[in-house]
């Protein structure tokens, strides 16, 4: 009778093992199904992220292309503006000189003019020209009696004199300054000490 009694625990043990196996299989299948379900969710989520990233990349690329084109357009406009500034830089100055030319033409058109009227006309024309020069900051360099300045004067000759050496004794041709830049130096004679 002991054998049947021993068989019962063996059978119970087998049943218990079978239940454990079934539970493991069931939980394994459940885990596998959960993993598959998660993969199914993860894959569409990654695909969505990829699509969004591709859209953003395309938008950034388009924005970059537009910015590049705009930069190129700005560069071309700047080059055109600079070229026009160089080309037409003296436009206003030239317009002001037209009045001087008109005065000279009017003086030449007078048939029976006297020397006095010609002189008066030339004097008025010179005043017009001086006004244009003043307006555009063109100033005369007339250094008579001043110390020689090689930045503004060009010595044409030296003359022995009693006045201090390196003094301008004669202005042969006036010079001109535009703002602070010498556009033509004054042509001058400069004193030197008398030789003994």
Curated annotation (Swiss-Prot):
GO molecular function of the protein, one example?
adenyl-nucleotide exchange factor activity
Gene3D superfamilies xref list: 3.90.20.20, Head domain of nucleotide exchange factor GrpE
One Pfam family in the UniProt entry: GrpE
- From the Swiss-Prot or TrEMBL record, state where the protein is found: Cytoplasm
Spell out the GO cellular component terms annotated for this protein, sorted alphabetically and separated by semicolons. cytosol
* Transmembrane annotation, as ranges: none
Q: Which InterPro entries match?
A: GrpE, GrpE_coiled_coil, GrpE_head
- Where is the major localization of this protein? cytoplasm
Q: What binding partners and quaternary form does the record give?
A: Homodimer.
Return the similarity comment: Belongs to the GrpE family.
Function (record text): Participates actively in the response to hyperosmotic and heat shock by preventing the aggregation of stress-denatured proteins, in association with DnaK and GrpE. It is the nucleotide exchange factor for DnaK and may function as a thermosensor. Unfolded proteins bind initially to DnaJ; upon interaction with the DnaJ-bound protein, DnaK hydrolyzes its bound ATP, resulting in the formation of a stable complex. GrpE releases ADP from DnaK; ATP binding to DnaK triggers the release of the substrate protein, thus completing the reaction cycle.
- NCBIfam families for the chain: PRK14139.1 (NF010737), PRK14140.1 (NF010738), PRK14150.1 (NF010748)
The protein in question is named Protein GrpE
Per the UniProt record, the source organism is Nitrosomonas eutropha (strain DSM 101675 / C91 / Nm57)
Which lineage?
A: Bacteria, Pseudomonadati, Pseudomonadota, Betaproteobacteria, Nitrosomonadales
Gene label: grpE
């Amino acid at each position: 009778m002991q054998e049947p009694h021993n068989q019962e625990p063996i059978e119970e043990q087998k049943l218990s093992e079978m239940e454990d196996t079934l539970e493991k299989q069931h939980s394994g299948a459940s885990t596998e199904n959960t993993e598959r379900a998660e993969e199914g969710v993860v894959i569409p989520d990654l695909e969505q992220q990829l699509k969004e990233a591709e859209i953003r990349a395309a938008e950034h690329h388009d924005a970059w292309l537009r910015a590049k084109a705009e930069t190129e357009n700005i560069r071309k406009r700047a080059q055109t503006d600079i070229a026009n500034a160089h080309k037409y830089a003296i436009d206003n100055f030239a317009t002001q000189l037209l009045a001087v030319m008109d005065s000279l033409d009017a003086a030449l058109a007078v048939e029976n003019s006297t020397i006095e009227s010609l002189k008066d006309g030339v004097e008025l024309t010179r005043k017009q020209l001086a006004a244009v020069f003043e307006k555009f900051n063109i100033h005369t360099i007339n250094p008579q009696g001043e110390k020689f300045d090689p930045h503004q004067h060009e010595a044409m000759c030296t003359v022995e004199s009693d006045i201090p050496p390196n003094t301008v004794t004669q202005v042969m041709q006036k010079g001109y300054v535009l703002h602070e830049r010498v556009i033509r130096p004054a042509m001058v004679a400069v004193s030197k000490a008398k030789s003994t």
